[in-house]
Design a protein with these regions (language model features):
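Nucleotide-state sensing region of NTPase/ATPase domains
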Residues: 47-129, 133, 138-145, 201-206, ...
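Conserved lysine of the Walker
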Residues: 35-36
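Conserved NTPase motor "head" modules and their coupling/switch loops across ABC/AAA+ ATPases, GTPases
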Residues: 1-31, 169-184, 188-308
């Protein structure tokens, strides 16, 4: 997978810039505040159709302009491609002359690994960051995983809305229906995440050992839902237990106003030498673990796509 060229117009601090890349290694050198990070963000954007730094496309538009454009020529295992993106008020994406209507249509064209100083929070930060790490990695190559994530969030919003209205209507058949969908989609998300870790965890462990004088890194999925039936292939048994948990938690969830069980509440447990890195790891250990996870992504994406 090689990006051959990139044209930027009105993207962050770039008025207009054209770049041609070497097929192997490229180094970007310059003074502070000259646009090195913005250039890297443009590369991240053409791979994911989103920024690694900004929350909205509008924030990426050069000051005083209405929108930005990115054009890239790249090659992957399927051949050569031309990409054109317009962003700002409305996003338009064209690949090889064809309009991309939904992000899922673009998944698999380009993959990217972003490593920044902020990735230390992947180890010591909120569990939501580690969940996002898993889901974003899956969504780079797996269309089904990406669609599942979108659908699960919508179903979760519906259940949470019903929970907040129980004082008025109680628990009715609508709750049963939404919970059934939540169980189905949630189970599939869990399976996807566990499959991801089956590949990623050993790679991270091997990398960590090589850069930390042999210290053992463990990456384990952490859930308040008993996963043993799912791990052993007893999916129906797991789903039935999942339904019962949601049913038992209805009163508590209604009081809190949100769903307290499910993959949206799970976490990764990262330990080195048997010690929790989030709670007790030194900053050096946390940085090494974050780097190990990021380097493991290289092997994972190679396994999934067949190319670097």
């Amino acid at each position: 997978m090689i990006i051959r060229s990139l044209d930027l117009k009105d993207f962050t601090n770039y008025r207009e810039e054209s770049l041609t890349f070497h097929p192997n290694i490229n180094l970007f050198v310059g003074d502070n505040a000259q646009g090195k990070s913005n250039l890297l963000d443009s590369l991240y954007f053409i791979a994911t159709l989103g920024s690694g730094r900004s929350h909205t496309d509008r924030e990426l538009v050069r000051w005083g302009e209405e929108g930005f454009s990115l054009s890239a020529a790249f090659s992957n295992r399927h051949g050569d491609h031309q990409l054109k993106i317009r962003g700002g008020k409305k996003k338009e994406v064209r690949i090889d002359g064809y309009d991309i209507q939904k992000k899922k249509e673009y998944i698999g064209y380009l993959t990217v690994i972003l490593f920044t100083p902020d990735d230390l929070s992947l180890i010591k930060g909120d569990p939501s960051l580690r969940r996002a790490y898993m889901d974003q990695e899956l969504a780079q190559t797996d269309v089904e995983a990406y669609v599942l994530q979108l659908r699960y969030r919508k179903i979760l919003e519906q259940r949470n809305t019903l929970l907040k209205e129980t004082w008025r209507h109680g628990f009715g058949q609508d709750m049963d229906a939404w919970e059934d969908q939540l169980v189905q989609k949630g189970t599939r998300i869990l399976k996807k995440r566990l499959e991801l870790l089956q590949l990623l965890a050993p790679l991270a462990q091997e990398t960590h050992a090589s850069i930390s004088e042999g210290e053992e890194l463990k990456v384990e999925y952490q859930s308040k839902t008993e996963l043993e039936p799912l791990l052993e292939g007893r999916e129906e048994e797991f789903m039935e237990a999942y339904r019962k948990i949601l049913w038992k938690k209805r009163e508590e969830d209604a009081q809190r106003g949100f769903t307290t069980r499910g993959p949206h509440r799970d976490d990764l447990n990262l330990t080195a030498g048997g010690v929790s890195l989030r709670k007790f790891g030194s900053q050096g250990q946390q940085r090494t673990a974050a780097l190990s996870l990021k380097l493991a992504e290289i092997g994972y994406l190679k396994e999934k796509t067949g190319e670097y």
